Regions:
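N-terminal targeting/anchoring "stem" of glycan-biosynthesis enzymes
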Residues: 2-566
């Protein structure tokens, strides 16, 4: 039994010894395999880490480059012009946000706009627009009994109709100097004088200067100087016949010193309305150098070389070049773009008397500007004869901020990839005001981005000539949007697109009063409701109707004598 036990014990010892030997061998194999796996894992993790490090480095470089590039563009684009630098503080200001909740909703919604993005989403109904055609350029016969002998000379800014009414010679207009814009441009610097005179020769006799025997007269001393204050804004033709005409016969000359919106209100005879349209839409052609640079601007925006529509033909004439834009810049089809006139310059902001959440510093700054440039308005404020900021906003008298414009475009369905040409002068508040816009719409360009400094040099310090370039880019755009329908450039572009657009020139015109009412609910309104109300607001302005009484024919030319309905 002891032997047996010994055997068993020995067997057991051999068993356990053998078992222990197998464990030693298995442990060595697993250890080697584990080490191999560990080395492979470390290699993979190291490789992935290198990729992440390289990717991070590249993103940092690209981000730095984009920030530097965008920063330089924005500094160049939104910087204050030198001629008003002393009036506007140049230090960086904090970003101005008035509607944080709506802006966040717009930011979340804009990606969905890309799915069904179509830049021409607000075309006017073709079957209605096609029935209206320009007709003010049809020649008139001189009425029987009307003499070709003229009653005298009129020195006037924009009164072709007055010269025709009073049977007088019209002296080429002289532009008044503005302390705001500091522009010395005259008529011949912007428009082709000879073409203007030739085109209207059957309607009005136009001369470039007074005859020598009248040049030496002291026009004010003889009582022939008439200022804007002497004529009521809505004076009728009868006023000019009863008051101005006898003065013209007596002295042989009348100088209207300033003529803003005079003889521009209903009721006007059909033939005078027709003449006003003929002058505005046909007789005024930009000088060749403006046409040439305007053509270059449009071609570079579109990345396309040829004329595309009737608006190109009327605005650019023979100056739509056929040479390539650049070797690598010509596309098979043109880039579509939306032109936006952001009328948020300091003069507009100050004159509106609105509050834009800029705090006490902004209020003091705007008040100081008004005291220099708008003394009459300043006096009204002191006498409590002006609207409060809240009243101005509720009545739709405040220009849209860049933030409000971005929210509106998002509600209308425009995606973040929309190519936007920004017209206008320098945005009040600079980059701090534009950040909310460019975050939603990064593809924003201006003429300063598109044209080289040498190409812009001839127009430097001539705001009227720079505005002519903006007019061309806006008028020929696939879509034109405005932030203030009362501004002169927006009104003229709107009318020009209606008159010459031939059914393919959609324009977005917000009703500022309605939009202000919608925005007043910004803390509670849901995005779907906001979007539908904004779209309805714009679509209702797309209705094709004849010009109502009292509306400007330059902005709404669908009226007898200007456009004819067939």
């Amino acid at each position: 039994m002891g032997k047996e036990a010994a055997k068993k014990g020995g067997g057991a010892g051999r068993y356990y010894a053998a078992k222990g030997g197998e464990n030693n061998v298995g442990c060595g194999k697993r250890h080697a395999l584990f080490c191999n796996h560990l080395r492979m894992a470390l290699f993979v993790f190291g490789l992935m880490g290198s990729f992440f490090l390289l990717d991070s480095l590249m993103l940092t470089v690209i981000h730095h480059f984009n920030l530097h590039r965008r920063g330089s563009l924005q500094r160049r684009r939104w910087i204050v012009p030198q001629n008003v630098e002393s009036e506007i503080p140049t230090e960086e200001r904090a970003e101005k946000i008035m509607y944080a909740r709506l802006l966040a909703l717009a930011s979340a919604a804009i990606s969905k706009n890309e799915i069904h993005d179509s830049i021409e989403r607000f075309n006017e109904p073709y079957n209605q627009t096609s029935s209206w055609r320009p007709c003010s350029d049809r020649e008139n016969q001189i009425p029987q009994g009307r003499t070709r002998t003229r009653s005298g000379y009129i020195l006037v800014c924009n009164a072709v109709a007055v010269a025709a009414l009073l049977n007088a010679y019209l002296v080429i207009p002289k532009f008044l100097y503005s302390s705001v814009w500091k522009d010395t441009s005259q008529f011949g610097d912007i428009y082709q004088e000879d073409f203007f005179m030739s085109y209207l020769k059957n309607d009005v006799d136009i001369v470039k200067e007074l005859p020598s025997h009248l040049q030496s007269l002291d026009i004010e001393a003889i009582g022939s100087l008439i200022t804007d204050n002497d004529i009521r804004k809505e004076s009728t033709p009868e006023y000019f016949l009863q008051v101005v005409f006898p003065l013209l016969l007596k002295n042989g000359v009348v100088h209207f010193y300033g003529f803003g919106n005079r003889l521009a209100f209903d009721p006007l005879p059909w033939d005078l309305q027709k003449l006003r349209c003929k002058c505005n839409f046909h007789a005024l052609k930009y000088v060749p150098r403006i046409q040439e640079i305007g053509s270059l601007l449009v071609r570079r925006i579109r990345k396309h070389n040829s004329s595309l529509n009737m608006l190109d033909e009327h605005l650019l004439g023979k100056h739509m070049p056929h040479a390539p834009v650049s070797r690598n810049d010509t596309c098979t089809s043109p880039v579509k773009y939306l032109a936006l006139h952001m009328r948020f310059e300091m003069d507009m902001v100050a004159y509106s008397l609105c509050d834009f959440d800029g705090g006490e510093n902004e209020r003091k700054e705007l008040q100081a500007y008004r005291e220099v440039h708008f003394p009459t308005l300043t006096m009204q404020i002191k006498n409590n004869n002006s609207l409060s900021p809240e009243e101005s906003r509720s009545l739709g008298k405040c220009p849209l901020t860049p933030e409000e414009a971005a929210i509106m475009l998002t509600a209308l369905g425009y995606g973040s990839r929309t190519y936007i040409y920004l017209a206008g002068s320098r945005i009040y508040g600079g980059q701090s005001r534009m950040l909310s816009f460019t975050r939603l719409y990064p593809n924003v360009i201006t003429k300063e981005d598109i044209l080289t400094p040498s190409e812009l040099a001839p127009f430097k310090n001539f705001s009227s000539q720079l505005a002519a370039l903006d007019f061309i880019a806006c008028a020929t755009a696939d879509v034109f949007a405005m932030t203030d329908s009362g501004s002169q450039l927006s009104s003229l572009v709107n009318g020009y697109r209606i008159y010459h657009g031939r059914d393919h020139a959609p324009t977005i015109r917000p009703n500022k009063k309605r939009f202000a009412r919608i925005l007043s609910e910004n803390r509670t309104i849901q995005w779907h409701d906001f979007r539908e109300r904004v779209r309805k607001m714009v679509q209702e302005n797309q209705r094709i109707i004849a010009r109502r009484k009292g509306r400007s024919i330059y902005r709404l030319p669908r009226t007898p004598g200007c456009m004819c309905k067939y």
